[in-house]
Amino acid sequence: MARKQGDSESGKLGNKIYYTWHGRQCERSMPTSVANPQTEAQQAHRSNFAMVSKLSSYMKEAHLIGLHWHAIRERNSTYAIFRQLNKDCFTPDGEINLPRVIVSRGSVEQVEITSATIDNGVASTGSAGIPFTVTFDSRVYGGKATDEFFLFVYYPALCTGRLATPVPRSSGLVTAILPEEWLYPAEPTQTGTNTLTHSSKNAFPLHLYAFLRSTRGRTSDTIYIPLPKETR
């Protein structure tokens, strides 16, 4: 609020600011709108950050292990490291570019994944799920036979994933038990009564992320392979 001091005023009244400078009465106007409104780029950056933050919670089973050593070195949480490493993993249309996502970081020697196969039989009632097996080159190059191989299967349709029980590098294969609906989503059919049938034609692609961890806790960089629905 402006105050009267003799023949002059000082203070703020509306968008006007009154003051005295070297004995003279002065005033200036405040802008009625923000000088630099949020640009489209800033809005996109905020949106991308929110998406990566959500993805870090969906993939926490993987990055809590795969980025643990890296987070210790950086003196930060694995969530923060995950967001930092994946802040630019986006397609031109603003979707997360899943093939570029990083869930582990390190210098442990990687392996080559040679195949990924699914048991074609539908899980029976009461079973835990359908076995999904990934084989990899078990020959040891720069790593050790005792290194652990971790496999994380991400299902974007439900924004969830599953971490398989780790196996030694020397084993050459790892099996994950996946929910039936990930592989063969149900669809209603008319056969006199409403029933559900399971078909791979409605399936969504799976994304496989793997890494190795040494006995000292160090990890490898992320190994990624897609599993398109056409392969099921």
Each model region followed by its residue ranges:
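Charged linear interaction tracts used for macromolecular binding and regulation
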Residues: A71-R232
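Long, polar/Ser/Thr-enriched low-complexity segments
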Residues: M1-A116
